[in-house]
Amino acid sequence: MNNNWFQTDECFDFYSSLSFLEPFKFEVKRGDEVKGRIVGYIQKDGGKLKQFFSRRAIINGGPMLTEDVTSDELESLLNECTKSLSGKAIYIESRNFNDYARFRNIFEKCGWTYEPHYNFHIDTSSIEIVEANLGKSRKRDIRTSLRDGATFEEAENLEEVKHLYNILEQLYTTKVKTPLFPWEFFEKLYNSPWGKIFVVHFNGSIVGGTVCVCGKDTVYEWFACGEEGISKSVFPSTLATYAGIQYAAENGYSRFDMMGAGSPGDGGYGVRDFKAKFGGDLVEYGRFKCILNPILYHIGTFSVKMLKKLK
């Protein structure tokens, strides 16, 4: 259970190919059989001082756990993870894509805390199901965008991916105000067997797109963006996400995972409202966090908040 592309050896190898990440992998076995696996990366931002205060370990998707994993096996896996990463990262965050409710007490016993966090799972078993579940406003936005000349397709070359990256970079600098992966990530993902990058064209320019990863039966939307306001009837962000959803439905994937939609009490979170209209199921599988260095964690959290206000 709880398996996803981010907990595979292929993902670990991909992380290992990136110069700006420090990958890690831990396993617990019963005999020769793996019963649990944690794959993730340590990320740092900026210069030496900022890197020191921004060291965090990210586990995308949450641990891979078999149906019959025991409490002792999971406890052993979590303890090995925290022991090995102590001193390397300030905190560890598991961003769950599946339901870990029955394991929550074990996580908490090992020093992890649970934080509510939303996500959307879209049923892409068929294009008919996708179309039936789309909200009326999304259908209208897609229809008018295509009618007035916008198109979407898989990126044909790295030059197109670079144009998309420039839009993402501007978005993260001005609105998201958190660090974006460097160009190396997008270049290598595009050239990998798992990456699918779609771009939106309008009036001869790339005006948006989405960056996806394809797992066994799920397409994951890692990044998405669009230059809104370029036309009253063209909606690049909507077309970008729909491109990934349509690809999933037409190529045998049963789910499109939006990889996060904010948390309760975040003031409405416009991105969640945007994602909701694609007709997916709102799930709350949350995140587990283990703070390895409380003092540095609180200093880092305060500093990030102040920097966002100053930008």
Where are these regions (language model features)?
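A conserved beta-strand-loop-helix scaffold within acyl/acetyltransferase catalytic domains
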Residues: 1-48, 96-233
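Aromatic (often tryptophan-rich) hydrophobic motifs at membrane interfaces
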Residues: 25-27, 64-66, 75-83, 185-294
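Active-site/acyl-donor-binding loops of N-acyltransferases
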Residues: 38-46, 105-129, 253-311
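Short, flexible, mixed-charge acidic loops at enzyme active sites
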Residues: 48-56
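A gly/proline- and charged-residue-enriched helix-loop-helix capping module
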Residues: 55-102
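Glycine-centered loop/turn motif at secondary-structure junctions
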Residues: 88-89, 111, 149, 172, ...
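Short catalytic-loop micro-motif centered on adjacent basic/acidic residues
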Residues: 91-94, 153, 257-259
